[in-house]
Design a protein with these regions (language model features):
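N-terminal acidic leader/helix
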Residues: 2-37
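Short, ordered beta-strand-loop transition motifs
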Residues: 11-15, 45-51
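Ordered hydrophobic segments in well-structured contexts
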Residues: 17-19, 42, 55
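Helix N-cap motif at beta-to-alpha junctions
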Residues: 24-27, 58-64
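Charge-rich, low-aromatic oligomerization/scaffolding segments with amphipathic character
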Residues: 31-35, 61-73
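Acidic, low-complexity, intrinsically disordered interaction modules
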Residues: 34-49
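A generic structural motif
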Residues: 50-60
């Protein structure tokens, strides 16, 4: 089985803040459900051909987004 974490990158952009980029579309869909249904987290999403980007803005930190993604992975 592939490691789902290898399909995810968390970056901090000076203009957009913290961005989680997921190259597994099924995992991204599940993560979006987790964010909206379980945590009511505010984010913007950008769908591209082979990846989905979650924009969390400048008010979040990479460590908070990593923790949120870790919580999501524990629910799978």
């Amino acid at each position: 089985m592939n490691n789902p974490n290898s399909n995810v990158q968390i970056i901090e952009d000076p203009e957009y803040g913290v961005i989680l980029v997921c190259q597994n579309l099924e995992l991204a869909d599940q993560f979006e459900d987790f964010l909206t249904e379980k945590h009511s987290v505010l984010f913007h999403i950008k769908f591209e051909r082979n990846q989905v980007s979650f924009f969390f803005g400048k008010t979040n930190t990479t460590s908070k987004v990593k923790e949120l993604f870790s919580q999501f992975m524990l629910t799978r």
